[in-house]
A protein has these predicted regions:
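N-terminal intrinsically disordered, cationic/polar leader segments
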Residues: 1-39, 44-50, 76, 89-121
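Glycine-rich active-site/cofactor-binding loop and its immediate structural neighborhood
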Residues: 53-61, 70
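Alpha-helical support elements that line or immediately flank enzyme active sites
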Residues: 65-76
């Protein structure tokens, strides 16, 4: 079990490294996700009716988590995002293997993605 979760953490770290560059000038308070212990900035734009996310974090595991969420939901329409099964995170066992503060941050990240989608329906 330990090795399996070590592999998943290593995968999250690699995902975090794969995020697009996030400009320092975009790291503003209005882009911070509230409820995360680490600082997580989330930005978006709408292109051809699809929401495209970009993000960064000052913590490597958290950066991997937001990268995973971006991979799942970026490029979808707001309606697709809102009708998505967000329990996928629970199905892969991510939430229960995070510290309570990281798990709360994960919930906050998902809530922010859903909020952005609902603002753009």
């Amino acid at each position: 079990m330990y090795e399996e979760w070590l592999d998943k953490y290593e995968y999250l770290i690699e995902l975090g490294k794969s995020l697009n560059d996030y400009p320092e000038s975009a790291k503003t308070d209005d882009r911070l996700i509230k409820g995360c212990q680490s600082r997580v900035w989330l930005d978006y734009r709408v292109e051809d009716g699809r929401v495209v996310f970009n993000a960064d974090s000052d913590a490597i595991i958290t950066k991997g988590i937001i990268s995973l969420l971006i991979g799942l939901y970026s490029g979808r329409t707001p309606k697709e995002i809102l009708s998505s099964d967000f329990s996928v995170v629970e199905k892969i066992g991510l939430k229960e293997n995070l510290s309570p503060t990281r798990a709360n941050g994960l919930v906050s990240m998902i809530a922010k993605i859903r909020e952005i989608a609902s603002m753009n329906v």
